[in-house]
Amino acid sequence: AKGGPEAAINMLNKNLDLSITDYVTVDFNAVVECVDLLGGITLDEVTDEEAVLMQGYMDEINKLTKNNSKYLSGGGTNVTLDGVQACAYARIRYTKGDDYKRAERQRTVLAAMVAKAQKSDLVTINKLIDAVFGDIQTSFSNADLVALAAQVFNYKLGETSGFPFNHGSTTLGSKGSV
């Protein structure tokens, strides 16, 4: 957002009557590194359409992160993704559901990462912390982040949903979706 994370928080708080005080932003490298350090994540389902759409995003992410991740051969159930593939999956926007579905995919990837981290050991958690410190922006101190990471085994993810809860969209000519 123009003005950085602080401006984004101010806008969200003002427009949605929230009281967000802290933030963490991550770049592609952080997602790729975390998923790879966890040994990949497994998703319940990746559709054939999603597998195809991931390819363009994977090309960009491979280039940016200096990786050489391979395309999925197709969709399926219980699909294990590496870091580049998981990041590409989370970026898909142009399917039925548009940006709302993209946000849902992002929540799915994050939940899979947390679940996998909770099954790992403290050595892996420490490697995750070391790997992502250079790839995040946050209002938290390093000590705060270490304390939060140490509690990863106790986290419980509740139900997640997008906003607005009821939504519709349409395409206006070549201008895209609204």
Tell where the protein language model's regions lie, with residue ranges.
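Flexible, polar/acidic helix-loop-strand segments at domain edges
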Residues: A30-T124
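C-terminal solvent-exposed extensions
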Residues: L81, D135-V178
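Solvent-exposed, polar/charged alpha-helical surfaces in well-ordered, non-transmembrane soluble domains
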Residues: E6-K14, T21, N29-D36, A88, ...
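Second-shell loop/turn segments in exported
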Residues: A1-K2, M11, L16-D22, G76, ...
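Structural recognition of the beta-strand scaffold that forms the well-ordered cores
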Residues: D22-T25, A88-Y89, E159-P164
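Residue-level signal for alpha-helical context at structural boundaries
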Residues: T42, E49-L53, K127-A131, V146-A150, ...
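Short, well-ordered coil loops that connect the C-terminus of an alpha-helix to the N-terminus
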Residues: L18, G40-I41, G158
